[in-house]
A protein has these predicted regions:
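Cysteine-centric segments in proteins
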Residues: 22-98
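Classic N-terminal secretory signal peptides
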Residues: 1-22
Length: 98
């Protein structure tokens, strides 16, 4: 890619992703296997106190990954989050939002 186009592409991609990132609701959740999840309004998402890598699918669906744990967050039409997890060894389930 031309040197001048690379920064422009990065800025465009960031600008497009920012509105979706902003719709993450504030929540705390507890999952089996002693997994604690916290999200600030607009992000980021923390798994057991560590900031997770966030993947945005759309304005209502996200995945946060840290240390072999993936947290899936879907935002319901009323704004409440539905949180589930997948961990090493195929462990998975629904998390309790507090």
């Amino acid at each position: 890619m031309f040197p001048i186009l690379r920064p422009l592409a990065i800025v465009a991609a960031t600008a497009a992703a920012s509105p979706a990132f902003a719709s993450i609701p504030f929540f705390n959740a507890t999952c089996p296997m002693n997994i604690e999840v916290h999200a600030d309004q607009g992000g980021p998402i923390y798994i057991n106190g560590k900031q997770a890598k966030l993947k945005v699918f759309n304005a209502k669906a996200y995945e946060a990954t840290h240390n072999h744990v993936t947290i899936s967050v879907t935002v319901n039409p009323d704004g409440t989050p539905l949180v589930s997890y997948t961990a090493r060894g195929g462990a998975n389930g629904i998390c309790m939002v507090k």
